[in-house]
Amino acid sequence: MKKRALAIAFLLASLIPSAAQAEEENGWYLGAKFGWSHFNPLKYDMNNSQVNNNDSSIENLSAPIVGLFLGYEFNPYFSLEIENDTNGFFPHLIFQKNNEHIQSNSVQLATKLSYPITDEFHLYTKLGGIVSWNDLSSKNTLKNLFSKESALLPSLSLGAEYIFNETFITRLDYTWKNSVKNIANASIKPALGDAVLSIGWKFGKSDISDMFSSDDSEPLNEQYSVLNENINFPFNSTELKPSSYDKLNKLDDDIKDMQLKNVSIVLLGHADKIGSDEYNQKLSEDRAYSIKNYLASRGFSRDKITVKGMGKLYPLTNQVCRDVVNKPLLISCLAPDRRVEIEVLSDVQ
């Protein structure tokens, strides 16, 4: 029996998702509740009166209930809530000290499992536990919180909510409460219950569609490669050849003739294998910048031209020139490696 009571308490912890799965959006919400409660006054202290435990006429009492709740929505299907409830709240008796009335204050921690019918209308169930503030302040109560005689009241709620404009919450639900002792003895009759109407405010939103959207989805303005060109350079040089100017001018004309939209250009500079890695890295970048400067002089925006030096990492002549030893012959053989690869991107495929 004790294990059954422990299982109820650990149910909350088992349902809490990891923080890594929580959305970055603000999921907090706050609200107030009011309704009618059927509760056992013998479980609580009485204001201005003493109750005889043998008086069965007041063993159960129907009275108003008011409260506040604070919750966090991890996603449209799972939330965690804490509530503070006041049972037996009769405003007209607050200042009448001679009148007997019973009032209890309790705190509830619950998980809220929702089933969205639409983005605005949800059905839900809540599983949790309720303890009075007086019981929480008692060391003996805390010591026996997970025993058969526990003051903890496990609770089950069923309800529906409608959210206006993604922020204003309205709810209607009914909560059954029973003692751990009854549950441990396999009693399924709920002894206590609350019928409640709630209103609240969400500080953020969590759309159902966001649950199934991919983080690595393609951008809306995807660009396509529409033109390519290679420009070769002399050995150990960043100077453009006359033939290179002709190629770049033709590339400019082709872009204009195609009436491309949102054009961007990627320049990848390369060097041959002669020299150190650091020197060739700098040389490859400088070659790419030579072309960027010329294209900018033709009217291209510098912000739309990306430059990257590749050094000697991607040779085209690796197999052809592998056995060449004579340096002049090697320089001539490696000519295709001294290049800048140009790729023109556009929204139009």
Curated annotation (Swiss-Prot):
The record marks 81, 171 as: Part of salt bridge gating mechanism. Gene3D superfamilies: 2.40.160.20, OmpA-like domain (3.30.1330.60). It comes from the Bacteria. Residues 220-348 form the OmpA-like domain. The keyword Ion transport applies. The chain crosses the membrane at residues 27-37, 63-74, 78-86, 105-116, 121-129, 154-163, 168-175, 194-202. One of its GO terms (biological process) is monoatomic ion transmembrane transport. GO terms for cellular component: cell outer membrane; pore complex. It is found in: Cell outer membrane. Disulfide bonds join 321-333. InterPro entries: Bact_OuterMem_StrucFunc, OMP/PagP_b-brl, OMP_bac, OmpA, OmpA-like, OMPA-like_CS, OmpA-like_sf, OmpA-like_TM_dom. Residues 1-22 form the signal peptide. Residues 207-218 are annotated as: Hinge-like. Keywords: Cell outer membrane, Disulfide bond, Ion transport, Membrane, Porin, Signal, Transmembrane, Transmembrane beta strand, Transport. It is a multi-pass membrane protein. Monomer and homodimer. With TolR probably plays a role in maintaining the position of the peptidoglycan cell wall in the periplasm. Acts as a porin with low permeability that allows slow penetration of small solutes; an internal gate slows down solute passage. Belongs to the outer membrane OOP (TC 1.B.6) superfamily. OmpA family. This is Outer membrane protein A. It comes from Buchnera aphidicola subsp. Acyrthosiphon pisum (strain APS) (Acyrthosiphon pisum symbiotic bacterium). The gene is ompA.
